[in-house]
UniProtKB/Swiss-Prot annotation:
The gene is hisG. This is ATP phosphoribosyltransferase. Lacks the C-terminal regulatory region which is replaced by HisZ. Heteromultimer composed of HisG and HisZ subunits. Pfam families: HisG (PF01634). Belongs to the ATP phosphoribosyltransferase family. Short subfamily. Pathway: Amino-acid biosynthesis; L-histidine biosynthesis; L-histidine from 5-phospho-alpha-D-ribose 1-diphosphate: step 1/9.
Length: 212
């Protein structure tokens, strides 16, 4: 039996759907009154751990899970050693740079030198501004980063944007897209190397489904 780390939240339903099509049914995790964090598949070939999206690469990297599904945004930010297996295509959103709508900034180079930029994704934000050779101070927030510009603490934010509705409702506007993030299938490198074909069969099944 192998272990899969499934992400709570927006990616969960599609993650369970793709594993179900590959022969591993963890539908119990979607039940409204469910409080369990571990599930066995209907065929007893695998079990799933229900974890926060940001923790998926941690469980996979440390070997507590053999496979996992995680957003590319989290995977890129974590920098943990995992096997990057497949782009699953769902859960799409942009990692974007946004500012107050009534500001004078229409592109990244308009931002003043050494201004503050709020983000949950500090490594991503730092890498982005370093590549542009723009000196900024990155302010790490774990909650609603939109409050950074609203309160005047930051000139801009780097955050995930799906529909743009949250930005609009808070008087913010995108001025650049950094990358496009989708759900990714990842694996523990040692688990894959020592696999007795159970993991490989599941990966190949998902690859075939994903190609349709």
């Amino acid at each position: 039996m192998f272990t899969i780390a499934l992400p709570k939240g927006a990616l969960l339903e599609d993650s369970i759907s793709i594993f179900k099509r590959a022969g591993l049914d963890f539908s119990d995790a979607l039940e409204e009154n469910n409080r369990s964090l571990t599930f066995e598949s209907n065929c007893k070939r695998a079990k799933a751990l229900l974890v926060r999206n940001g923790d998926v690469p941690v469980y996979v990297s440390y070997g507590q899970a053999d496979l996992g599904i995680v957003g590319y945004d989290v995977l890129r930010e974590s920098e943990l050693k995992v096997a990057k297996l497949l782009d699953l295509g769902f859960g799409g959103c942009h990692m974007s740079l946004a500012v107050k709508k009534n500001s004078n900034y229409s592109k990244p180079t308009d931002l003043p030198a050494n201004c503050k930029v709020a983000s949950k994704f500090t490594k991503t934000a730092r890498s982005y501004f370093d590549e542009l050779n723009i000196p900024v101070e990155i302010v790490h927030l774990t909650g609603s980063v939109e409050l950074g510009p609203i309160t005047g603490m930051a000139e801009a934010i780097v955050d995930l944007v799906a529909t743009g509705k949250t930005l609009q409702e808070n008087g913010l506007i995108k001025i650049d897209d950094i990358f496009y993030s989708t759900a990714r299938l990842i694996g523990n490198p040692l688990s894959i190397r020592l696999d007795d074909n159970h993991l490989r069969d599941t990966i190949l099944s998902i690859e075939s489904i994903n190609a349709l």
